[in-house]
Curated annotation (Swiss-Prot):
Source organism of the structure: Saccharopolyspora erythraea (Streptomyces erythraeus)
InterPro entries found in the cross-reference section: CB, DNA_brk_join_enz, Integrase-like_cat_sf, Integrase_catalytic, Integrase_recombinase_N, Integrase_SAM-like_N, Tyrosine_recombinase_XerCD
A Pfam family recorded for this sequence: Phage_int_SAM_3
Gene: int
CDD domains: INT_ICEBs1_C_like (cd01189)
Name recorded for this polypeptide: Integrase
Family: Belongs to the 'phage' integrase family.
Active site: R214, K245, H379, R382, W405, Y414 (o-(3'-phospho-dna)-tyrosine intermediate)
The protein's role, per its UniProt record: Is a recombinase (or integrase), catalyzing the cutting and rejoining of the recombining DNA molecules.
Length: 437
């Protein structure tokens, strides 16, 4: 027989024995998305269990972190929803590519089967997962990047009430040794500039060393952004290669001809970089071969931040080098005739098309070899430019504007002490302690 119930005040929880022989609990959690009261129901054989569950719901409600109604989400479902429907609204292309790799290649295969509301209490699951990644041969930096992606994704789940706490913010991230950057010394810079100016687009690398432009910013420079009267250069865009997407209805079948079924042999000469792994059974990649491909190739995008949109005044010699380069490009344009693609790019292929970032990187490596200078990343040119500003004693505010930094804290990452500065300090100490009064 159903236990007689008295009407509780609005918002109060109710516990009663039903005709079905089960104890029932009903808790008002707030207002649902449809504007109606969000009333949760608990059903158990034992009254104490119902009392306990009702208490949990009440504490959840009172804390302000109410879980959404409906079937509990798995980690896979949430990560897929986040990376496909939430992150793209605010993230740039390269950031999204990193998120997609972390989610689809690592997080979903490793943790996707867990229930979202249960894994929140087990940060150790993530720590064990990172350890498995590293033990499988992946670099700690890769595991650390996956950790950062998971922290962001689960942080969004917390904000939206899917979980009551972010387990990834508690989990220990893999330790990553910070890569030591050695900017080029003055003598090396001079050798690099000399070797670069022997090549078609050599001024592009002089700009990188002198102004600290990022690779994409350098390749996206256009002639209309050069102010010849004021001798300034406006930096507002970046050039990047984006991945093509299938425009067809059956991506797997479309790319079937290019599916890799076996790993490369030990003495593989086909790939200049690391050999790619075999394709998964349901591979939907190889979109660049799709006749209806969309959204890929070289794309001009906005610079990374508002601070990145900047105007720099050119040193006289650099300005003259740019004008000389313009004349040489004009001769190339006349020689190419109708084959020339006029995109107003400052640095181009012989037919006027923009330069691919990979081709640009290969050119940089060749310049270093020709100059007899040690190996250095192309981005080290930006570190070198920032360090030169340090040596020259340029005020922090001016450095921020020239480099396109949004925060002065970037100075700690980009400015380095080079040998000439160390030697100067040693000379000063020598004079102070052992010099003649």
């Amino acid at each position: 027989m159903e236990q007689k119930r008295t009407r509780n005040p609005n918002g109060r929880s109710t516990i009663y024995l039903g005709n079905d022989g089960y104890w029932h609990g009903r808790v008002t959690m707030g207002i649902g998305d449809d504007g109606k009261p969000d009333r949760r129901h608990v059903k158990r054989k034992d009254k104490d269990e119902v009392v306990e569950e009702v208490g949990k719901l009440e504490r959840e409600r009172d804390s302000g972190n109410v879980r959404k109604k409906g079937q509990p989400w798995t980690v896979e479902r949430w990560l897929t929803h986040w990376v496909e429907s939430i992150a793209p609204l605010t993230c740039r292309y390269k950031t999204m590519r990193g998120y997609q790799t972390a989610v689809y290649k690592h997080l979903i295969p490793g943790l996707g089967a867990h229930r979202l509301d249960r894994i929140q209490n087990h940060p150790e699951y993530f720590e064990k997962f990172y350890l498995r990644m590293i033990e499988s041969g992946l670099k700690p930096a890769t595991a650390h990047q996956v950790h950062r992606t998971a922290r962001t994704a689960f942080g969004e789940a917390y904000k939206r009430g899917r979980i009551q706490r972010n387990p990834v913010s508690i989990a220990k991230a893999p330790r990553v040794e910070e890569e030591e950057v050695e900017p080029l010394e003055v003598e090396d810079m001079q050798l690099v500039i000399k070797a670069a100016l022997e090549r078609r687009n050599g001024v592009r690398y002089v700009i990188a060393l002198a102004l600290g432009t990022r690779q994409g910013e350098s390749l996206a420079l256009k002639w209309p952004r050069l102010n010849r009267q004021k001798r300034t250069l406006r930096i507002t865009k970046a050039l990047q290669r984006q991945t093509w997407k299938h425009g067809c209805s059956d991506p797997h079948r479309c790319g079937a001809t290019y599916h890799k079924t076996e790993p490369c042999k030990a003495a593989c000469k086909r790939h200049t970089r690391a050999c790619p792994p075999p394709c998964p059974p349901a591979c939907t990649e190889h979109a660049r071969w799709c006749p209806q491909r969309t959204g890929g190739g070289l794309v001009e995008v906005d610079v990374k931040s508002r601070a990145g949109r900047r105007t720099v005044t050119l040193p006289d010699q650099l300005f003259d080098l740019i004008l000389k380069h313009e004349k040489l490009q004009g001769a190339e344009r006349e020689l190419a005739g109708t084959e020339w693609h006029d995109g107003e790019w400052m640095f181009t292929q012989p037919n006027g098309k923009p330069i691919d970032p990979r081709q640009d990187l290969d050119e940089w490596k060749a310049i270093l070899v020709e100059a007899g200078v040690r190996e250095a990343r192309l981005h080290d040119a930006r570190h070198t430019a920032a360090t030169v500003l340090l040596v020259l004693g340029v005020p922090d505010r001016v450095v921020m504007e020239l480099m396109g930094w949004s925060s002065v804290t970037m100075k700690q990452r980009y400015m380095h002490v080079i040998d000439s500065v160390r030697n100067d300090v040693a000379d000063r100490l020598n004079t102070y302690f052992w010099g003649t009064n």
